[in-house]
Amino acid sequence: MGKEKFQRNKPHCNIGTIGHVDHGKTSLTAAITKVLAETGGATYTAYDQIDKAPEEKARGITISTAHVEYETKKRHYAHVDCPGHADYVKNMITGAAQMDGAILVVSAADGPMPQTREHILLARQVGVPALVVFMNKVDMVDDAELLELVELEVRELLSKYDFPGDDIPITKGSALCALEGKQPEIGHDAVLALMDTVDAYIPQPERPIDLPFLMPVEDVFSISGRGTVVTGRVERGIVKVGEEIEIVGLKPTVKTVVTGVEMFRKLLDQGQAGDNIGALLRGTKREDVERGQVLCKPGSVKPHTKFKAEAYILTKDEGGRHTPFFTNYRPQFYFRTTDVTGVVTLPEGTEMVMPGDNVTMDVELIAPIAMEEKLRFAIREGGRTVGAGVVASITE
């Protein structure tokens, strides 16, 4: 049978399953597709199809990720599930699979484990907006008090990492029962209840086009008699001819006016998210703008040099470093379209960072970059990628 075409008349949302190894993330993913397939909202994808996820490259890093899609009455979802813990770390840090929200899977039989904690921390650091919880394997626990205890532990852990632990919906069930068609109240019905909480609790993300205008500068030309043209792909928002914009990063911020927008050599009255455009800037000299700056809606983005980041350092096999690095490491940080040198300070108690580690670190750049939380970057040495990171918070 041919692939069903999903009707794109529902709002779209990207989610994923996170949590400790063997707590049932992949079983739950399979169970969601099985239960929603009954109402035509999904094609059932079996556990072993999801588990042998294909490898993908994101920013030069190989990541195994499985993608399934399904829909509820309310939304259309793209759902990511990773086979290994390292894949989650890489995925969340590189933003390879954007997550607007996540389902944290915790085994009721084991309670929160080290990767439960690490995935919650990563979700906080990389800016996953909302989590819901599925307490799995409740068929293996006879003691109701034990279930309450695990729920309490999970809520405390969420609160510790600045998620609203008291308010986050927790659904108790068994992915295996749902897959095997047993005990519907903890199987089939629990999966439907979980999807209701995902629908209700994970906020609908804003579409890129509705956000404030931003375009990274890729190239700058001067056209005699017309002025300076800046080219790039609009990252978000809309820019209209005649609008005032700011040029931010690397140099002091300046204001200018967009006097023309062209795409494929045709003049347009606006450029929007996803468009590759040339923007003609009034009274701007060719040497006033350079690659690595951004054009943006005035006041929407500020230039910064100091930030806290969550980073993943590539292994030797991934083409990364062969040796550890220490505080005062000075690589290049590749933001959007350019490299800027920065100095790394490791957290108290972290002596060094080995290839294959993920780490929270402080960075100070030698030149300011238009920056905000959740912005992704690559860490490079002489043009070779040795790591990937995300801005967790801005220091100054």
Swiss-Prot record:
Record InterPro entries: EF-Tu_GTP-bd (IPR041709), EF-Tu_GTPase (IPR050055), EFTu-like_2 (IPR004161), EFTU_2 (IPR033720), G_TR_CS (IPR031157), P-loop_NTPase (IPR027417), Small_GTP-bd (IPR005225), T_Tr_GTP-bd_dom (IPR000795)
Location of region: G5: 174-176
Annotated spans, G1: 19-26
GO cellular component terms attached to this protein's record: cytosol
Keyword Protein biosynthesis: yes
One Pfam match: GTP_EFTU
Segments for region (G4): 136-139
GTP-binding listed as a keyword: yes
GO MF entry, a single one: GTP binding
EC number: 3.6.5.3
Region (G2): 60-64
Location in or out of the cell: Cytoplasm
tr-type G domain ranges (all copies): 10-206
Top-level taxon of origin: Bacteria
Binding of GTP, residues: 19-26, 81-85, 136-139
Annotated keywords: Cytoplasm, Elongation factor, GTP-binding, Hydrolase, Magnesium, Metal-binding, Nucleotide-binding, Protein biosynthesis
Residue ranges of the region described as G3: 81-84
Catalytic reactions of this protein: GTP + H2O = GDP + phosphate + H(+)
Cystine bridges: none
Residues binding Mg(2+): T26
Family under the similarity heading: Belongs to the TRAFAC class translation factor GTPase superfamily. Classic translation factor GTPase family. EF-Tu/EF-1A subfamily.
Function: GTP hydrolase that promotes the GTP-dependent binding of aminoacyl-tRNA to the A-site of ribosomes during protein biosynthesis.
UniProt subunit comment: Monomer.
The name this protein goes by in its record: Elongation factor Tu
Organism listed in the record: Methylocella silvestris (strain DSM 15510 / CIP 108128 / LMG 27833 / NCIMB 13906 / BL2)
